[in-house]
Amino acid sequence: MNRIFKSIWCEQTRTWVAASEHAVARGGRASSVVASAGGLEKVLKLSILGAASLIAMGVVGPFAEEAMAANNAGVCLTYNGSSNNTSGTGGWFADGCKSAGWVQGMVTNSKTDWVGLTADDTQIVLDGSAGSIYFRTGGINGNVLTMSNATGGVLLSGLAAGVNPTDAVNMSQLTSLSTSTATGITSLSTSTATSIASLSTSMLSLGVGVVTQDASTGAISVGANSPGLTVDFAGGQGPRTLTGVAAGVNATDAVNVGQLASLSTSTAAGLSTAASGVASLSTSLLGAVGDLASLSTSASTGLATADSGIASLSTSLLGTADNVTSLSTSLSTVNANLAGLQTSVDNVVSYDDPSKSAITLGGAGVTTPVLLTNVAAGKIAATSTDAVNGSQLYTLQQEFSQQYDLLTSQVSSLSTSVSGLQGSVSANTGTASGDNSTASGDNATASGTNSTANGTNSTASGDNSTASGTNASASGENSTATGTDSTASGSNSTANGTNSTASGDNSTASGTNASATGENSTATGTDSTASGSNSTANGTNSTASGDNSTASGTNASASGENSTATGTDSTASGSNSTANGTNSTASGDNSTASGTNASATGENSTATGTDSTASGSNSTANGTNSTASGDNSTASGTNASATGENSTATGTDSTASGSNSTANGTNSTASGDNSTASGTNASATGENSTATGTDSTASGSNSTANGTNSTASGDNSTASGTNASATGENSTATGTDSTASGSNSTANGANSTASGDNSTASGTNASATGENSTATGTDSTASGSNSTANGTNSTASGNNSTASGTNASATGENSTATGTDSAASGTNSTANGTNSTASGDNSTASGTNASATGENSTATGTASTASGSNSTANGANSTASGAGATATGENAAATGAGATATGNNASASGTSSTAGGANAIASGENSTTNGANSTASGNGSSAFGESAAAAGDGSTALGANAVASGVGSVATGAGSVASGANSSAYGTGSNATGAGSVAIGQGATASGSNSVALGTGSVASEDNTVSVGSAGSERRITNVAAGVNATDAVNVGQLNSAVSGIRNQMDGMQGQIDTLARDAYSGIAAATALTMIPDVDPGKTLAVGIGTANFKGYQASALGATARITQNLKVKTGVSYSGSNYVWGAGMSYQW
């Protein structure tokens, strides 16, 4: 039969398609073409080449349709519901287009328009009716979608927004994600800033603390809401300087050094006024000597002036006394304020108001005075605003006392001079031999130019010299000697007082027996001596023999260069040394001793406090009876002792005897080198040890004890917490009553115990007694070697065992229990899940209530049970009771030895049987099922497909509802039946009932014994016959002589004639075929692009990729994804774009 074809434009597929001569194209774009045999061969060759490429690369996974025969290639065109024709190679296409075996179940004569290309088992089908393109490949590697061109990747456009977790996303979704992310970040930033501002406000509003500031007023308070009355500024190194102190106004205000300097200035002013009165008196006396006639008047005037001077001096002294009284009163007030303070961490100094102009100790508005202690000495200067301490005031009081004594001596000397003057008024027998000289008194001699000698036996031999007093002598130029037996022999020297001597140039000696022999020296006070250059001795029997030295106080001695001794019996013999306090001694160079009996003998040493001793170089002793004998040592506190080099002892009775040691706290002891003890009775005796806390002890080398009564006796050990004990080497105990006795052990938690070497116990009552064991959680126990217990009341007693979870128990060697109430008692067993149990050796139970009791058994899933040796149960309520049995799926059961059940409710009861699929049953020995509701009851039988049944021994049923009931029978295809012994049925609905019969094809029937029915609907009812059709549906057989009758086969000649006719008909289809070729090229490129996408790798769950391909200049891009649903099930899908066509495909495979 001849047909004429034409090509028309399909609006749905947007392609040119082949159609009947009677078809009309919408829009009138149809065109008639004449196809040539060469054109068809070209299309077929290209199709075969493209299909071969797909086979080599792999496309979408296999489908369930029947595969075509191998080594065949061809094309099948179907339109208007009927098959056009087929050009192919090989036996599969030898007799025309096949109606079955196409991808997606395509069947000839059942679809309106479709084109199929095949090469062996790899196919491409263009379904015009559905507007879809389908792919299938026999390969297993078609899992890569690659899109590329000569310069790189290609653009995939028109992509819809992804919905499912495995969908691709487009640019719109990505932009939306970026926008939402930016919004989230902005929101986070805003909320963070708000939180920080809130935190700042909360911190500023704190009412109790060390130093707080009100958030609203800015006022600073110190412990405003705490009841303590004492502020202690002392640090680890002693008192601190309080700077920025405003001048006190009220009786309870602190005073600064500026106020103290002002007081000193007013005192000096009083002294200056007294000196001015004395000078006025001397001038008057000189006038009396010049004119005897007016001597009486001048004397009276001088006496009056002297009286005035004395009165002024008295007034100044009274004013000074008032100032001292006022100062004493202020000091009494300060002392009263400071006396009321109690040491309190919660009480600190705060500003009274936001202006920060005043600070009231005890808080704003408090009228009860408080004591301010441990105030470092403030800087004394006119511009200083520093606070001063009691020591500085005491020194000022001592200096004032000395100046007062000096003034008393000067007034006494003045009284003597007046008495001598009165005697001179009666008789003047002195000799004045110098130019402009004056001599008054018996045997008075003034031989120097402008000299004055006033007094019995007084001598003024130096130019501009003045000698006033009995036996007074002024021999130095510009010298002055005032007082009985006073001597001023140095240039510009001044001797003021009975038997006073000033022999050094610019020297001054004031006081009875005072002696200033050094250049620029000053000696003030009875028996005071200043022999050093620029030295100053101030006080009764004081001595300043060192250059630039100063001795202030009764019996004070400053013999070192630049030394200072202040206080009764104080001694400063070291260069640049300072002794401040009664009987204080500073003998070391640059040393300082402050306090009664304080002693600083070491170089650069400092001793502060009664009976304090600093004998080490650069040492510091601060506190009553404190001792710092080690070089660079520091002792702070009553009876504190720092004897080790670079040691520090802080606190009453504290002792730091080790090199670089530190003891901080009452009765604390640090005897180990580099050791630190902090706290009452704390003891650090080990080298590099640290003890912190009351009664803490660190005796091990590099040990640390932190907490009340904590003990760290092991080398490199650490104990933290009340009664914590770390006795093992490198051990650590943290928590109340924790104990770490094993080497390298760690106990962390109240009452925790780590006694095994390298053990770790973390949690209340946790216990790790095994070597290398770890116990974590309350009441956890790890007693086995290398064991681990993690969870409340967990137990790991087996060697190398692990128990994780509340009440978890791992008692078997190398066992692991994970989950609440889990138990692993078998050797090498593993229990994972709540109440899971693994009692068999090498067993594994995973899931709530899972149980693995058999040796080498595995149970996975809720309530799963593996009781047989080497058995495996995987799935909720699954059961594997047979030896070596495997059950996979919910309620799956493998009860036979070596049996395997896979799928929900699957059952494999036969020995070595396999049941795969939901409700599948394999009851026969060595039987196999694969498919939902499939059944294999015969021994050695196999059933594949939904509801497939293999009842006969050695039978095989393949396909949905396939039945193989005969012994050794085979049924393949949906609804196929092989009931005869050794019978075979292939094809949907095929039926082989005869013994040894074969039925091949849809609906084929072979009922005769040893009969064969080939082809759809074929019937072989007679024994030992072969049928290729049925009555009324006969088929031709080729390669025979020319047929004559209606049922005869035709020969090659007849076939060639038929092919020639077909070619003549196809000549007019060339344009349509060319269009088809172009579409095929694009389709091949699209299909190839799908194959370029890599498959999901073993061990991974999901893979998403893109691919590209080019075939004969036609470019395609593809996007695909592969997902591994389970270990046996894998799904693949993809979409490809070429030109204006889209290709998509999906596949699924189940493997076992």
Swiss-Prot record:
Q: Which keywords appear in this protein's UniProt record, sorted alphabetically? A: Cell adhesion, Cell outer membrane, Membrane, Protein transport, Signal, Transmembrane, Transmembrane beta strand, Transport, Virulence
Compositionally biased residues, Polar residues: 427-442, 505-519, 589-603, 631-645, 673-687, 715-729, 757-771
Gene Ontology biological process terms in this record? cell adhesion; protein transport
Record field: compositional bias (Low complexity): 443-504, 520-588, 604-630, 646-672, 688-714, 730-756, 772-840, 848-886
> Which N-terminal stretch is annotated as signal sequence?
1-71
Q: Where in the cell is it found?
A: Cell surface; Cell outer membrane
| Region of interest: Translocator domain | 1100-1152
Q: Where is region (Disordered) located? A: 420-886, 900-949
**Upregulating conditions:** Expressed in vivo during the course of aerosol infection. Expressed at very low levels under routine laboratory growth conditions.
Family, according to the entry, reads as follows:
Belongs to the autotransporter-2 (AT-2) (TC 1.B.40) family.
What does the record give as the function of this protein? Answer: Involved in virulence. Mediates adherence to human respiratory epithelial cells.
Q: What is this protein called?
A: Autotransporter adhesin BpaC
- Gene that encodes the chain: bpaC
